[in-house]
Amino acid sequence: MECCRRATPGTLLLFLAFLLLSSRTARSEEDRDGLWDAWGPWSECSRTCGGGASYSLRRCLSSKSCEGRNIRYRTCSNVDCPPEAGDFRAQQCSAHNDVKHHGQFYEWLPVSNDPDNPCSLKCQAKGTTLVVELAPKVLDGTRCYTESLDMCISGLCQIVGCDHQLGSTVKEDNCGVCNGDGSTCRLVRGQYKSQLSATKSDDTVVAIPYGSRHIRLVLKGPDHLYLETKTLQGTKGENSLSSTGTFLVDNSSVDFQKFPDKEILRMAGPLTADFIVKIRNSGSADSTVQFIFYQPIIHRWRETDFFPCSATCGGGYQLTSAECYDLRSNRVVADQYCHYYPENIKPKPKLQECNLDPCPASDGYKQIMPYDLYHPLPRWEATPWTACSSSCGGGIQSRAVSCVEEDIQGHVTSVEEWKCMYTPKMPIAQPCNIFDCPKWLAQEWSPCTVTCGQGLRYRVVLCIDHRGMHTGGCSPKTKPHIKEECIVPTPCYKPKEKLPVEAKLPWFKQAQELEEGAAVSEEPSFIPEAWSACTVTCGVGTQVRIVRCQVLLSFSQSVADLPIDECEGPKPASQRACYAGPCSGEIPEFNPDETDGLFGGLQDFDELYDWEYEGFTKCSESCGGGVQEAVVSCLNKQTREPAEENLCVTSRRPPQLLKSCNLDPCPARWEIGKWSPCSLTCGVGLQTRDVFCSHLLSREMNETVILADELCRQPKPSTVQACNRFNCPPAWYPAQWQPCSRTCGGGVQKREVLCKQRMADGSFLELPETFCSASKPACQQACKKDDCPSEWLLSDWTECSTSCGEGTQTRSAICRKMLKTGLSTVVNSTLCPPLPFSSSIRPCMLATCARPGRPSTKHSPHIAAARKVYIQTRRQRKLHFVVGGFAYLLPKTAVVLRCPARRVRKPLITWEKDGQHLISSTHVTVAPFGYLKIHRLKPSDAGVYTCSAGPAREHFVIKLIGGNRKLVARPLSPRSEEEVLAGRKGGPKEALQTHKHQNGIFSNGSKAEKRGLAANPGSRYDDLVSRLLEQGGWPGELLASWEAQDSAERNTTSEEDPGAEQVLLHLPFTMVTEQRRLDDILGNLSQQPEELRDLYSKHLVAQLAQEIFRSHLEHQDTLLKPSERRTSPVTLSPHKHVSGFSSSLRTSSTGDAGGGSRRPHRKPTILRKISAAQQLSASEVVTHLGQTVALASGTLSVLLHCEAIGHPRPTISWARNGEEVQFSDRILLQPDDSLQILAPVEADVGFYTCNATNALGYDSVSIAVTLAGKPLVKTSRMTVINTEKPAVTVDIGSTIKTVQGVNVTINCQVAGVPEAEVTWFRNKSKLGSPHHLHEGSLLLTNVSSSDQGLYSCRAANLHGELTESTQLLILDPPQVPTQLEDIRALLAATGPNLPSVLTSPLGTQLVLDPGNSALLGCPIKGHPVPNITWFHGGQPIVTATGLTHHILAAGQILQVANLSGGSQGEFSCLAQNEAGVLMQKASLVIQDYWWSVDRLATCSASCGNRGVQQPRLRCLLNSTEVNPAHCAGKVRPAVQPIACNRRDCPSRWMVTSWSACTRSCGGGVQTRRVTCQKLKASGISTPVSNDMCTQVAKRPVDTQACNQQLCVEWAFSSWGQCNGPCIGPHLAVQHRQVFCQTRDGITLPSEQCSALPRPVSTQNCWSEACSVHWRVSLWTLCTATCGNYGFQSRRVECVHARTNKAVPEHLCSWGPRPANWQRCNITPCENMECRDTTRYCEKVKQLKLCQLSQFKSRCCGTCGKA
């Protein structure tokens, strides 16, 4: 830790202090302040605006040391600079404008955002690329980066948060609020899809309001975006966004990017105006716009100041409230605006005590009482709980809670709720009756009622409550059945009665009931007791009886009483009328007549009411067969008026009559199923449903058939729909786990977890992690928690056991095991695999020990190295090498590397690879005998191998050759080859310098980079070897075939080329050359001129290849017997060289004459030989093909040699510039087929080609003859047209016509001495680097119309230049244009009122009436302009007869007039040019409608007498059914219905209409009659037994619940006190609560009573507190005697009318408040001398406001003296 010295003045002290600041530890300074003096004052700010820095110093008071910092910094002047201030960094750069830099003045501009040193002052000279660091650091307070608040202090960039504090990391949220939580804005995202419209050219995409941030819109499609703006002042603007760039629109920066298929619009914000993004439709296709931005919440809650105190003295309280504030208009608005945003949380009111001073003894109005000092706070008060909404199963009970205030007299009044918000509001609802509802409990079944066959069994079902008590209240609908059938396995032999009692006739059953008393059964039933005696002894009285609900318990054979609601069915009458005879007092004498009269009168009384039929009810169905029921009414026979049904005798009620109705079949209709659940909960899911066309044949049989969809006339409802089309909330989406980091011992596996949001269109949007509120799933987890197998842990080698001579080194081994917890533990050594002895002990060798008394001579070890280079050409299993050289080998070869060391023991030899010690492994064997073996080479084996024998060291470099004869890139190694080879014996520095010099041999500018030259000595021969491998050093075709692993491929190669096997017999496995030979070549090349170096390098490489082959063949020839040498001629066919140079190796001089028939047939091959370099001054030039001849003034003769081999012997011919050479006395063909030119002239310049031909093929080689070395270009004068091939290649000078999308290669073969440099031009402009240039050729990939033009190749060297050109024409085949507006406009102009149609490749159709004319358009584009030919019915239209037509607009429009049936059909236009053809079609159809009678429709009924079949009548157009309205004018065929299915119908249930509900609310019952009827073929419906219908269908229900809604009503409380707001003199408002409740008093939501008229909840009332009015005082004196600035004021207050005391102003708010100030003395001043016009001028002067014009003019006198 450095000491803190005493502060001394100067910049050096500040600099050192800041260094101390950066080196201090992070301990708190407060712990160490005891030795420090107090902090000094803050320095002045480094800037006056824009954010600067200020510092403070302190000194150390101790003589020892003080820990901590002696300087501290803070930000200052954090206010925005005015626009004219400019950039702070730019000001510092401009300060150097008057200082010369290198003797010249510059205008300096700032260079910002330097990633390496942002706090240095780097500036750029205006108008140049010169960038200079003018100062090592900028002034304190300069921003590090333009888009960051971080600032530079003492040359270092310090972090600054958005709170402008140093070291703060707080940032702005998406709303622009520093350290905000994002609650002041909301994310808006959406998608807009344009709709093609002929009448609508543009549309609004989205409106982005003022203040929005982070806006991004992406348009995909052909349409175009543009902007409309509107500022807060109402100024409107528009920006068309015509080009890519960054614009300033209404002071908002807009970044716009325009692409061929999309447009991107970005605005960082905040926006300074309202932006409306609009889209301009192009009309070609739909476009989609996706947008996202953060919209500010402009309405926010704002906490108010405290309200006035509730008491003026003696202690009161005051509260705050919250008001909704509009940030745009800066005004308070209604609260509903803030409730619109869920993010807005209304602040809770704050409460504080106030006016705690005691009240004065008397204020003149009242005597102070003790209770005046007590003022209780408002409180919540609740009403009693209402009755529970449910008697069981959990209900709700509620109460009203209101805020009340108690005055000093104890009167309680309701006040606004906000006054009680300082405490939690009491709950207004709570659960109640949460115990279970009564449930049905079924007991065990009784035994079967029969002993054989089928019978019945019964059980008791009781309603049990939650305490286990028998009670009522269970739902009858859910009651389990109490009776079921049972079968006894014993058969019955007694004949049974055919019909059960239930099936007997009604009157027979009634007789049975009268005769038999009701008996108790095992099913609950009503059991009436006997009638009581008549209540009177004479006359008409009543009788009563008890009716019980009883059940027979079969298991106990006892009768149990049940609640009445346990029995089903109507309850028997418990009361009836009775007649006890006349009440005359005398016993009459029996008189039959009188008796008849008496009882006859009673009979007449009974017969006064009777049942009668009154028509039928409405048909129950509108189609498909319904039923009508005869209406039976009880009528008064005398008045014929309806009476109550109980007045008629029930037993005499006539039977029910039913008849069928509306038997016509229902039309086919769509049957729609229910929607399935949505497949997704958000982010657009799908719902499906079944929709099918059905036809109801018979309602009584419920017979329905499914029809084809086209038979339903109505449009088919949708079977699928989107659902939940809203954005999902952001959620975490984890990816798959990655593989474990370990295979055992406890590893870790990771995965990527992204925060994404599934959008309403199904796509996913990746969001920042802060958007996902849920906890983030784990990104990593433990894995492979099992223990690892035991392994050896080896220590370092110990020192040698001796100080000289031979010794040993040892190391220890520990058996270690990695546990699943990740910790290691030592285990028993038996658990580890056996350890080789060599792994724990090895020999070591130090300096030889000196023998005492005898002088000795030191002989250091020596390694016999071989300085050779090896190049493997054929696969071989194993190769042996000696260290000291370089080897370029094929993969999978085994290598044995020997280290022949002398004067050292073999076991002491050690091996290294790339500087790392090598030990034996399964792949590399380090033998103790001084050699190293590598098994099957792989790329990682490439590198530098070093053998060490004591101080002696030798290296061996191994590199691999890939399958494409390229050197394999070496993997990364810890040490470079340069570092390893630098340790070679014999001066590493000199070797390195020599290597670096030789590396430059192949480099001339960019070519060195292109060849990838080596950067270390281990790669110095790589370029030569690569050239040998790539440029035909030996027959590559034979090598490639031999490299194949499959022996079958070798056999194939031998069969195809019989000479290949002979060549391979003489081809070496490895080519060997001396390193010094390669060093000589590199040295020779370094001495050549730079422009000829590449040319000679190719020459020397080819000679090197010949030498290698020749030395190998000569060595092999000496090993063969003479006979073998005579019969083994080998000729190696050369490999064509890129540059024209080649090597020719002939190992037999027998020529073509030798061998005779023994030689195999082979194609011609011209031998490429290398001649000596031509001397320009030679008079006779003799050369071989493949070179360049330069004609000089002294050249007398040129001899061009052409030697070819092949069998049969090839024929030689010569050509010049592609044309056959015309021999003359000056141009001669020699006997050896050489071409000689005597006295060459300029006309002889050109490319001469030797062609060798026999029956098997041909070969050709060219040679260039130039004039004095001038450039020569091989040209071709031909036109190439390409429409199909993917690539085309031509020589310069040709004309190319090709379609788009192909690759075009233009060859520019040049010659000249020195070699000419090629430059390409397009339309006389030089082509840049992006074009593909290779060896003089120009490659144009994927050509388009923009590539069309004139391409020129210029060849230039020291002797001149030559330019040749090729014209490239892009053909565009005929195709349909994407924009059809032009052809449509052409059709509209040709025939404005004529129907028209455009042709298309797939064909279009136009339907016309007979006699009309039509226009057919053929939209086409192409280059050249296609020629259009029209056809009709496949024949040229010019040959069509009977067709009136005109061809217009150069063939693009065909007008056909007076169409008829013969002229309709297919019209086609054929467009063709050089690039292709296109056929488009359109059909003209003459429409004609007619009626068609089809098959009979389905029978309208399946039975009965109403079934008919109607013949189906359809309106057709060209055999296609259309709307029948089209056939309205056609004669309709007469059709007659046919009767069908006239037979008896099976029995079916007939139901009547439902009766009226028994209750209007609270749950009632509806009933209807259900009978079994049978419809005869005659149409008569008769009742039958119910069993006949039960077999067909289940009996319909005859009772159902209705009007289940609760019975509700409005209820209200009593009127509250008259303490509401004043609305006039003496008038206030009082309130009462109005709520919805059931008749039982249960409170319900108000919506339940919405159908009922709601009582008023407020009314006006008389209030003494509202006896108030505004009182004003007199106006004060005017503040000025003249001018425009005088004003006067007065006091305005609200006072009580009786007491004349001031009261709160809100009590007078019902009337307008008088003005409390006004202008005055608005008259011009008479004299214009400088004087004050207001009395406030002294304050103006004290506040230094005189510089403001409005104050200076009014205080002229005072400010003039200032």
From Swiss-Prot:
Alphabetical list of Gene3D superfamilies matching this protein: 2.60.120.830, Immunoglobulins, Thrombospondin type-1 (TSP1) repeat
One annotated GO biological process: extracellular matrix organization
Cellular compartments per GO CC: endoplasmic reticulum lumen; extracellular region
Site (Not glycosylated) residue list: W36
Keyword list, A-Z: Disulfide bond, Extracellular matrix, Glycoprotein, Hydrolase, Immunoglobulin domain, Repeat, Secreted, Signal
Residues with glycosylation annotation: W39, W42, T48, N251, T312, S391, T451
Domain (Ig-like C2-type): residue spans on this chain: 861-963, 1164-1266, 1286-1369, 1395-1485
Residue stretches making up the TSP type-1 domain: 33-82, 376-424, 436-493, 522-584, 607-665, 666-729, 788-850, 1545-1608, 1666-1726
Tissue: Expressed primarily in adult skeletal muscle.
Effect on the protein upon substituting W385F: No effect on secretion of ADAMTSL1
Paired cysteines (S-S): C45-C76, C49-C81, C60-C66, C534-C578, C538-C583, C549-C567, C678-C723, C682-C728, C693-C712, C800-C844, C804-C849, C815-C832, C899-C947, C1202-C1250, C1308-C1353, C1418-C1469
Signal peptide: 1-28
SUPFAM superfamilies: Immunoglobulin, TSP-1 type 1 repeat
Chief location of this protein within or outside the cell: secreted
Domain spans labelled PLAC: 1726-1762
Effect caused by changing S391A: Small increase in secretion of ADAMTSL1. About 40% increase in secretion of ADAMTSL1. Dramatic increase in secretion of ADAMTSL1
Effect of W39A: Significant reduction in secretion of ADAMTSL1
Effect listed in the UniProt record for changing T451A: Small increase in secretion of ADAMTSL1. Dramatic increase in secretion of ADAMTSL1
Localisation: Secreted, Extracellular space, Extracellular matrix
Keyword DNA-binding part of the UniProt annotation: no
Annotated segments matching region Disordered: 1120-1164
InterPro entries, per database record: ADAMTS/ADAMTS-like, ADAMTS_ADAMTS-like, ADAMTS_CR_3, ADAMTS_spacer1, ADAMTSL1_dom, Ig-like_dom, Ig-like_dom_sf, Ig-like_fold
Subunit-structure text: Monomer.
Protein name per its UniProtKB record: ADAMTS-like protein 1
Organism this protein belongs to: Homo sapiens
